[in-house]
Curated annotation (Swiss-Prot):
Keywords: Ribonucleoprotein, Ribosomal protein. One of its GO terms (biological process) is translation. It comes from Rhodospirillum rubrum (strain ATCC 11170 / ATH 1.1.1 / DSM 467 / LMG 4362 / NCIMB 8255 / S1). NCBIfam families: L29 (TIGR00012). HAMAP family: Ribosomal_uL29. GO terms for molecular function: structural constituent of ribosome. CDD domains: Ribosomal_L29_HIP. One of its GO terms (cellular component) is cytosolic large ribosomal subunit. This is Large ribosomal subunit protein uL29.
């Protein structure tokens, strides 16, 4: 199962919680990068993409009832 399918299978509350958690992680990663303590630089990119994926799914769900 792809990451997008995993994200779509979550409920709205789970998506909200995941988004909040990822934003906190992104904040911490930004500070680690600024202070030179960041070891896994690829994690910044991964977190950013996961946030975008969640926002995309939430947008799809918001637009879906309007299309019908």
């Amino acid at each position: 199962m792809s990451a997008a399918e995993d994200t779509r299978s979550k409920t709205d509350d789970q998506l909200k919680d995941s988004l909040l958690e990822l934003k906190k992680e992104q904040f911490n990663l930004r500070f680690q990068a600024a202070s030179g303590q960041l070891e896994n630089t690829a994690r910044v990119r991964t977190v950013r993409r996961e946030i975008a994926r969640i926002k995309s799914v939430r947008g799809e769900r918001n637009r879906a009832p309007q299309a019908k």
